[in-house]
Amino acid sequence: MSSSGDARPSQKGILLPAARANDTDEAAGRRSIAWPVARTCPFSPPEQYAALRAEEPIARAELWDGAPVWLISRQDHVRALLADPRVSIHPAKLPRLSPSDGEAEASRSLLTLDPPDHGALRGHFIPEFGLRRVRELRPSVEQIVTGLLDDLTARGDEADLLADFALPMATQVICRLLDIPYEDRDYFQERTEQATRPAAGEEALEALLELRDYLDRLISGKTGRESGDGMLGSMVAQARGGGLSHADVLDNAVLLLAAGHETTASMVTMSVLVLLQHPTAWRELTVNPGLLPGAVDELLRYLSIADGLRRSATADIEIDGHTIRAGDGLVFLLAAANRDEAVFSEPEAFDIHRSARRHVAFGYGPHQCLGQNLARMELEVALGAVLERLPALRPTTDVAGLRLKSDSAVFGVYELPVAW
């Protein structure tokens, strides 16, 4: 992908980074877009987002394959459209942000079904991610975090916070939740990372298929014996009873495993990095852990590591003077919506005392992230323990020297070297 320095002005605002921009695009009021849009700062959305939100919050754009799409960047528009029943998530209708998109048309995951099928399927998983179940899981997460920090401090006074803490923590939690062998972590971590890199193309598709095959073998093993105590076993048991199909179990196992460790690991790492850049907030949270729940929501808003939700219109939609036609693709810029001045005062500032719960980091509407309660709890436990156990934590490299994961659907850094 070209860098943000390649952006050129158009007649209606700016061009997002892309390999292609021509007079026809500009005359038509379109901008070309390459995905994911490059971030040049780990703490800010792509620099073009603010201008888009201010000047053209519902904007026409052109994707890598020439397909037209609408970019939605203001929060009121994001919420209205994501909750609109005329907006679909069916993969066959979605805009393709990269060559690896659009290959899951037969999938039956929570992120590929529209109502009413989506609601019926989601109902099978809600108890596993409700507040009661998350409270029950908290002691187990605390045990994992304590063990990892014990190992970390016993080995010395330096570490890579991502590789040595955040990723093992998130992986152990999802392995316990699903009842997946932790010793297989290298295999599924590598494939998940590859599958979430849009630019990887065929390699991303191959990694996704290998991840599916791996989980299919685990599911088949549980089908012929005791299904076990984890969520995967519970899904298999429901399939035995006719409540779920094999495709339901497999497709959602892939979703839960992939989303359940990489995103959380990146969010923990990036959250620590943000707090290290704001020593006053770090000290306040060390003294008053009761501020952590609010700080977690502010971190989710401020970082917005998952961006670019895809949808399509199933009927004509009139919104704020624009007509979105049936069949049009939509891309929701969540990172832009989470910096909306109409919703958050001084949105570019990081403020653990603000009420940030109105963020859309988990999406919005019927497909809002099912695991958000678990994610919040993991962040609270992990950050609280780091603040308590490693109060003198510091990065051992300049932020400018960190390698950013700008080629991934889940933004983050490749490593975070720290000392204490």
Curated annotation (Swiss-Prot):
Gene3D superfamilies: Cytochrome P450
Coiled coil (residue ranges): none
Catalysed reaction equations from the record: 20-oxo-5-O-beta-D-mycaminosyltylonolide + 2 reduced [2Fe-2S]-[ferredoxin] + O2 + 2 H(+) = 5-O-beta-D-mycaminosyltylonolide + 2 oxidized [2Fe-2S]-[ferredoxin] + H2O
Enzyme Commission no: 1.14.15.34
Binding site for heme: 118, 122, 311, 367, 369
InterPro entries: Cyt_P450, Cyt_P450_B, Cyt_P450_CS, Cyt_P450_sf
Region (Disordered): 1-28
Pfam (any one): p450
One example GO MF annotation: oxidoreductase activity, acting on paired donors, with incorporation or reduction of molecular oxygen
Keywords, sorted A to Z: Antibiotic biosynthesis, Heme, Iron, Metal-binding, Monooxygenase, Oxidoreductase
Pathways involved: Antibiotic biosynthesis; tylosin biosynthesis
CDD domains linked: CYP105-like
Any one biological process term the GO annotation gives: antibiotic biosynthetic process
Family: Belongs to the cytochrome P450 family.
Function: Involved in the biosynthesis of the complex macrolide antibiotic tylosin.
Name the record gives this protein: 20-oxo-5-O-mycaminosyltylactone 23-monooxygenase
Species, as recorded: Streptomyces fradiae (Streptomyces roseoflavus)
Gene expressing this chain: tylH1
